[in-house]
Amino acid sequence: MEQLKTIGRELAMGSQGGFGQSKEFLDLVKSIGEARSKAEEDRIVLSEVDILKRRLLEPDIPKRKMKEYIIRLVYIEMLGHDASFGYIYAVKMTHDDNLLLKRTGYLAVTLFLNEDHDLIILIVNTIQKDLRSDNYLVVCAALNAICRLINEETIPAVLPQVVELLNHQKEAVRKKAIMALHRFHRKSPSSVSHLVSNFRKRLCDNDPGVMGATLCPLFDLISEDVNSYKDLVSSFVSILKQVTERRLPKSYDYHQMPAPFIQIKLLKIMALLGSGDKNASDIMSMVLGDLFRKCDSSTNIGNAILYECIRCISCILPNPKLLEAAADAISKFLKSDSHNLKYMGIDGLGRLIKISPDIAEQHQLAVIDCLEDPDDTLKRKTFELLYKMTKSSNVEVIVDRMIDYMISINDNHYKTEIASRCVELAEQFAPSNQWFIQIMNKVFEHAGDLVNIKVAHNLMRLIAEGFGEDDDDADSKLRLSAVESYLQLISEPKLPSLFLQVISWVLGEYGTADGKYSASYISGKLCDVADAYSSDETVKGYAVSALMKIYAFEIASGRKVDVLPECQSLIEELLASHSTDLQQRAYELQALLALDARAVETILPLDASCEDIEVDKDLSFLNGYIQQAIESGAQPYISERERSGMFETTDYHPQDHHEVPTHALRFEAYELPKPSVPPQASNELVPVPEPSYYSESHQPISTSLVSERESSEIKLRLDGVKQKWGRPSYQSTTAASSTTPQAANGISTHSDAGVGSSSSKPRSSYEPKKPEIDPEKQRLAASLFGGSSSRTDKRSSSGGHKPAKGTANKTATVPKENQTPVQPPPDLLDFGEPTATTATAMDPFKELEGLMDSSSQDGGSSDVMGLYSDAAPVTTTTSVDSLLSELSDSSKGNSRTYQPQTSKGPNTKEALEKDALVRQMGVNPTSQNPTLFKDLLG
């Protein structure tokens, strides 16, 4: 019965298309596979893209359908088309709780996105959540995504959780955690520098898979610093020995070879640790010998391990037995019919030649067979081996074979490499000068402009300086052979430009040196070169310079110079050339022909091309001229640095330029909101001292102290700040423009000293334009609050002018007895912040009670408390003259002593509390009627 159910499920899957996919998807794959052209394939894929764009926009797509759509998007991307419109759906699928859908989403995301994509930030939180999952398959899926997508900026978000997973109970999770840390080390070594010890610990893991994964990061670490891991040599050797003895589970075997990939990685690590270390090499020798005996050379994986053993032996200190075993393995490789094994044999032979050159002689015939093999890759590898085998006895044969091969190939890159190797071998092992010149001529002739220009310069320097044996005859023969060979080649129809430059330079320097060839003959050849390659300005420039040298040597030797007609026509042509370089060379040649022998010999000495030229950067030869000019009254030279007045400021910069950036992405969770605390009054930022009143007799002494104390306190600058609450009202504008205390009602106030003392310059250019005040409102305010208006007018009239010191001191010395300072009447229309005054211990309410009593006695001052009574409103037609008279009377009357009296009307404290509440809440008056305060205060 169960078998029938299984068959039924398989038939159902087959009807759907197999593997849970729809028949529509399989038809898509089939149609693309049967496409006969790239255009037909593109048409099918673009049609599928249009279908998916419409399908993905449909609402309430079933998860099974969405999974199929994501797989189809992956298939479209694999074919090289853009499916970026569906990336976000793959990201959303990683959030699904279903394991199959989540893994599908992670697979698609790792294929769609790269580490710098903008959508990476959207899956970081999902990865963090999945790393904490109880299902180890979900954790593995998240770790796979980390190994592909996490960049340097997002490493700190997942690093702590990955480190915790190193101790997970599942070996698959531990293995993938090691792989994730390896990626972190490659992307940002500094982020995991403190976690390197974890790699050492996981090397001893019970699971071979975790241990094998640890070898990869350890290989990178050892490549960077070998000495720090010398203590692990015995551990690696022990692990390799256990692997070769088949102590690992059978599941790690590959083609009956025990854990071959772990063996290969261990051999690479041992090659690094044993380089130049005799003790480490001795420890490794035994297990390496066992590998040569146990490896099966009949399989590719066995040959791979043998090849890695040969590489390891070539790196550590030599051991005769190991070298013999390696030579036998190489012999098997070279005798094989497989080109791959021959290639491995040639490469291994090239490595062992450095240790024992005699090994190559045992395989001469095999090397020649590889050199004649039609496989181009094998032939190139053989030439690399010949290059390493070259010495004086075989240099001619090897270089000739290399030049023949260079002529036969069309690969410019490899042709350039072969040419440079031929030049290098000819310079090191040339048996004669003539052979050297011939080889160089062949290289330049056939490689042409592919030869590096440094090779041409080195050749010219070698011809000029000789072989450095202080043998002038040998050097002369070398130059003569070069001139003769170049005169033969110069008639060739097509020569490379670089070779022509070398020919022109050599003929100009040494064409007439031995007297075998006349100047007219050499100059004629050079003119032919310039005429044949008229489109190449560089060659023509070298030819003109060579003519200049030939004529200079003739003039310096005292011989008569006969300029050939073709040379004269060439000079005339170049004098009118569009090239400034050729024109300059022609003018110099023309001027040189008119000089005498002594001048020419000084300008162009014979065979001085390699003489060292000392450049006097300080122009010390002008010191005498400069001193003479200064003595004659000339101004000394001032350097540009001294003129600009700039100095080095590097000492003032911090030395550590590698500061950790303070602005970075934060991936930790937000803090929970704290319960709200009712605000409390605080005076830490803006302390507002209580008002104090000093007698005029003590004012001069305390003024400076108060100013200094207030200037040191922290205060807000409210001048020029637009008020948010209340109707626009008239405000004083001189608080910031003057630091002189202003007198109000006969008493000097220092409410603005803290602000004004910080700056004595007016801030009108920085303050915003104040709104214009209606004149009717000004008259109303003046009629209601005479004292405040007088103070405002007085400040505005005297703002920006500082009174003389003598006047202030004189006023301060007038004795005043039993005077009680009076607070100016409050400006109830000012709903702004109160101005700061000097702190005092007096009760402000008692002071205001005294103010009311004095106001009731003084007929010249306005009754402030009467505003809160039911008295008739004051008319707004009060004249300005009467207002000024009231101000003068109030200022005079304030000097009298006031006696406290019983106040009439409403309670003073209640009225002030209401007034303070109104100031705080910012209630706007509804009309210009003076009884508005009755509405506000009740």
Swiss-Prot record:
Is Phosphoprotein a UniProt keyword of this protein? no
Quaternary form?
Answer: Adaptor protein complex 4 (AP-4) is a heterotetramer composed of two large adaptins (epsilon-type subunit and beta-type subunit), a medium adaptin (mu-type subunit) and a small adaptin (sigma-type subunit).
Residues in HEAT repeats: 118-153, 154-190, 192-227, 234-272, 321-358, 359-395, 397-431, 454-495, 517-556, 562-601, 874-911
Composition bias type Basic and acidic residues, residue spans: 764-779
Checking InterPro entries in the record gives: Adaptor_Complx_Large_Subunit, AP4_complex_esu, ARM-like, ARM-type_fold, Clathrin/coatomer_adapt-like_N
Q: Where is the composition biased (Polar residues)?
A: 694-706, 808-821, 892-906
Q: Which Pfam families match?
A: Adaptin_N
Q: Does the keyword Zinc apply?
A: no
Which protein, by its recorded name, is this?
AP-4 complex subunit epsilon
Q: Where is this region: Disordered?
A: 690-712, 725-867, 880-912, 919-938
Signal peptide from the UniProt entry:
none
Q: Tell me where on the tree of life, at the top rank, the source sits.
A: Eukaryota
Cellular compartments annotated: Golgi apparatus, trans-Golgi network; Membrane, Coated pit
- GO BP terms, alphabetized: intracellular protein transport; vesicle-mediated transport
Name its species. Arabidopsis thaliana (Mouse-ear cress)
The entry's keywords: Coated pit, Golgi apparatus, Membrane, Protein transport, Repeat, Transport
